[in-house]
């Protein structure tokens, strides 16, 4: 099979696009997402990255987005970190531009499927992948098949109540912002041995541990 694929990871911070052959990324592009811009400008940004990668051998395009998705129709709803993206017919828009099939799903689902097929979890049939970033979510593979639930939202664990808020507040970048810093800044301070930053990461790790315990349902 000489065909190639393009994978796109859309986030509120960055947009990444990779040209993939035989399960391996042969070229990767990344740039800051125009998250505060109108809907069409963000679509154009994605299309621009795809346009730099596409060749006649590209058979299909896959896109992961941080939101619930009507996967059958490729409609994206209420994307985290991109206020203008409330209802975007992403599949139709990109298929018209490039003339190849476009598949859209929740980014955590894409993450879980990739790890279970090509990554560290390829030897396992049941997998839960937790993604941490601007928010927190999970992708679920059961019996080797991706489990999406309704509107691809089966792994939307961030909104589950936890302490006085929810898991997303304590297990994402919001945790650091709520304490007057950022994950990157706290990381750099911790590397330098700052006791306050080390304590902050210790607390953050505790919240992640409780999230994992909740997923595993251990006694």
What are these language model-derived features?
Residues 102-107:
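General beta-strand structural signal in soluble alpha/beta enzymes
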């Amino acid at each position: 099979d000489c065909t190639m694929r393009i994978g796109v990871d859309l986030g509120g911070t960055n947009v990444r696009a990779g040209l993939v052959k035989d399960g391996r990324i042969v070229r990767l592009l990344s740039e800051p997402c125009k998250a505060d811009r109108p809907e069409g400008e963000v679509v154009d940004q994605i299309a621009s990255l795809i346009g730099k990668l596409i060749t006649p051998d590209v058979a299909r395009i896959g896109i992961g987005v941080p939101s619930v998705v009507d996967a059958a129709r490729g409609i994206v709803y209420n994307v985290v970190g991109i206020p203008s993206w409330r209802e975007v017919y992403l599949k139709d828009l990109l298929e018209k531009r490039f003339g190849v099939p476009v598949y859209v799903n929740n980014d955590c689902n894409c993450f879980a499927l990739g790890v279970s097929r090509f990554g560290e979890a390829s030897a396992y049939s049941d997998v839960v992948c937790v993604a941490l970033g601007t928010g927190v979510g999970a992708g679920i593979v059961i019996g080797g098949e991706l489990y999406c639930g309704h509107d691809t939202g089966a792994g939307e664990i961030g909104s589950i109540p936890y302490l006085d808020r929810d898991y997303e507040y304590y297990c994402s970048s919001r945790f650091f912002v709520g304490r007057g810093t950022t994950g990157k800044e706290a990381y750099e301070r911790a590397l330098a041995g700052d006791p306050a930053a080390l304590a902050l990461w210790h607390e953050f790790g505790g919240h992640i541990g409780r999230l994992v315990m909740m997923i595993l349902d251990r006694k």
